[in-house]
Amino acid sequence: MSMNDINSLSQTKWNCKYHIVFAPKYRRKVFYREKRRAIGKILRQLCEWKGVTIIAAEACPDHIHLFVEIPPKISVSGFMGYLKGKSAAMMYEQFGDLKYKYRNKEFWCRGYYVDTVGKNESRIAEYIDNQLKEDEMGEQLVIPSASPFTGRK
């Protein structure tokens, strides 16, 4: 960790970095094309408004990875409540068809995964950068379904 990694607030020095993963309700694969671009733009905007720095991020079809630096004046749970609540409202505003897929405007799953980032910063950034490729490889390993009666597709 270098001195460049340390931030300051009035009389506080801090280096609070987190790897956060969260998914849409029912883990639906919704982040393709324009919805993928839209969620990226929305999350960048919301993070900027809160003073949160995005170090690395990836929108996979059925989940989001964020590697962020959150100031200590903001709790992770408070930030995630804000991020998921506002982003859901903004997605519903842009894409009216989502209302029919998700009841009661519950776009995101209730929970999320969070881990502190210590000395593994470069590894986590690399992991997030390669996450989309890993998901695609996993999907390619799926055996195509065949008819149980004829053996053909």
Range-by-range predicted roles:
Residues 1-153:
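Basic nucleic-acid-binding interfaces
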